């Protein structure tokens, strides 16, 4: 049984695990049609809550979110901003997001930097997204 995202984040301890949410596979296919990836390497599979968490860290309880915007640095990093529990603000101060696609030589973790530097363009209409609490690593 999960706990609220902030409690899961704050109580995650230290370790090599990553906790967050996976995207529902069927909805992922629909989202890839709705938001065509701009770069060749498609990621589009999860939202991170906390990296370097303990292996026994509790998973978050939230199961719904909203895709509320998009960012693209024009050089190979594209991400979709996600609102969870009414906020895009992750407890660590960064932004909840899905790394959507990457260009050659770019890495998913760079989405955090792009969002911090550029923010995101908010959509007129948010898109509901199913979230599956998961140990991502």
Protein language model features and the residues they cover:
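Histidine-dependent nucleotide/RNA phosphoesterase domain, centered on the 2H-phosphoesterase fold
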Residues: 6-137
């Amino acid at each position: 049984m999960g706990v609220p995202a902030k409690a899961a984040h704050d109580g995650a301890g230290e370790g090599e695990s990553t906790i967050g949410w996976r995207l529902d596979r069927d909805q992922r296919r629909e989202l890839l049609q709705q938001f065509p990836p701009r770069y060749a390497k498609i990621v589009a599979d999860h939202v991170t809550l906390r990296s370097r968490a303990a292996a026994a860290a509790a998973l978050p309880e939230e199961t719904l979110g909203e895709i509320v915007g998009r960012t693209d640095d024009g050089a190979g990093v594209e991400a979709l901003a996600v609102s969870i529990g009414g906020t895009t603000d992750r407890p660590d101060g960064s932004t909840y997001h899905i790394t959507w696609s990457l260009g050659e030589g770019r890495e998913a973790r760079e989405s955090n930097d792009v969002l911090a530097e550029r923010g995101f363009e908010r959509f007129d209409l948010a898109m509901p997204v199913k979230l599956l609490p998961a140990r991502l690593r």
